[in-house]
Amino acid sequence: IASGSHDWENRLENNIWTYTLEDIWSGLQDSYQNLVNDVKEKYDITLTKVGSIGFSAMMHGYMAFDKDGELLVPFRTWRNTMTEQAAKELTELFRFNMPQRWSGAHLYQAILNKEEHVKDIDFITTLAGYVHWKLTGEKVLGVGDASGMFPIDSTTRNWNKEMLAKFDELVAPKGYPWKVEDILPKVLVAGEKAGTLTEEGAKLLDPTGKLQAGIPVCPPEGDAGTGM
């Protein structure tokens, strides 16, 4: 057993609680390097490969990307209470509680605010989903983390189709080029194949180039939800 860590703190910018992409990657790289150092110190082994990897991170919030994979607006974390109108309207529409912090509430609030970026959305995800995507190329999310984006059908263990349809009907007059299911990650449950670490992903985690690609990665999950 070995460990590595990194301390970070969110920042308030333009009245939005956020982390930059640089914060995310520098923090992950620092944690990984500290893990490598711990393995070397304890066992005199240079870490190049592990049996499997999993990511868990803060749930909810809003990370929206265009078709080129570019972040459209700064990451809006779960701490933001800026979606009151959207949360209220969706709760009434779905007859299901949609808290302000959920990604669906953030998306609908951006629509209500007539934010320019909404028409360009190709993919929305959580922090764990973002990291997993960049390291594996897979746009997937564990069902636990997914349940903090949009309502889940507990029978199918997938997005609630009825509520997806209601959302699409609600925003149809806006004429966006997407349906909501098309921009959400694919939902997976524990044990399902979620991809492997790519060459690019390995270099993102370990810029020294020692970490090998091909390591299986489990579905990304919410707070402390992965591999525990």
Positions of PLM-derived features:
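Short glycine/proline- and charge-enriched loop/turn segments
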Residues: 7-11
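Short hydrophobic alpha-helix segments
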Residues: 2-6, 75
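Glycine-rich phosphate-binding/catalytic subdomain of phosphoryl-transfer
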Residues: 12-18, 25-26, 30-228
